[in-house]
Amino acid sequence: SLAIKRLNQTDDMQIVIEQSLLTSKYMMGVPDSNRDRLLSYLNYAKLKNKVDKVQFYKELFYKAYMLENERAYIHTDKLLDGNSWYDADRTARICQKYVELVTFRGRLKTAVTNAEKMKLNKEIKTEIQVLESEEI
């Protein structure tokens, strides 16, 4: 499990969890391509932004998040392998849009009316266009 945390703004002795992620369970000793893929992307040598601990951990968190939700966006591999991880601001924008895309896709599954589905599909299309414009 991973989480993006920060100090509470009113009480410096408390920590606030902004986002959390629980990865899938993987059996130890049993070959698993998904586990191997996750571990390869989270390998220290493959992580790109090692400027400070915060950016390093955020890259770790968001790569794990993207791998857990890679069905949400067809070009997730391009995002994971791209060089946008060197730029903290760009990474934050991309990851925020990716989280919104995953949220909209989840809400689309539970939508009942066609009006809701159409609205969510428009939002999904917009998020995908933004992600594609951020890619290199």
Where are these regions (language model features)?
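Selected N-terminal structured segments and early membrane-anchoring regions
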Residues: 1-78
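Alpha-helical oligomerization segments
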Residues: 69, 77, 81-82, 88-136
